[in-house]
């Protein structure tokens, strides 16, 4: 069993493995009181006035307490981050990392700006960790890039992947969780998808270009993909619970 887990971990692409590792270490460290969540959460005042810039990163690494909800989010992170990196961004590690950085920047900007809007500031002030929203962004992007894959939700009903974000959003509302986390992820995901996929087809211009320093860190690799015998190879059955 341990060997199988080790093999599964080693076979993960580098960005997925790095993010999953950092998230698990951070969350476990907080659960064991080795790390304090108060040193990790997003606080604009502390970032600007006390130069605690690490909070812009660490708030994406903490998935709250170690419970069943944490396990589900780790599953979502490992699954959809891996699917994107191995398929849509296969051989383009720098582009994938740039997508995550773009999403993190959009999410942070929304929370910071929302915190300055009357009547909305109180709601945005409660959003101090954006890890779940970034995970949801990956789910959204994957669903837009694979809209025709058939999925099943808890064996209750089937749908195509294009509706996956809405199914998860509906489930969050059904169990009484805040919809803000999912909505923010959908906004960030749609912003990326529009600028990276839709807008270039409309104007023949690409506003999102991966910076050269990221390209230098992760050079593009040539990809040779054998045609699968079953066209539904990438459509692993979806039988998951989503909670926030």
Curated annotation (Swiss-Prot):
Pfam family, one: DER1
Keyword flag Aminoacyl-tRNA synthetase: no
Keywords: Endoplasmic reticulum, Membrane, Transmembrane, Transmembrane helix
Domain of life: Eukaryota
Transmembrane segments annotated in the record for this chain: 22-42, 97-117, 122-142, 153-173
Lumenal membrane side: 43-96, 143-152
Any single GO BP term: response to stress
Protein name: Derlin-2.2
Native species: Arabidopsis thaliana
Lineage, broadest ranks: Eukaryota, Viridiplantae, Streptophyta, Embryophyta, Tracheophyta
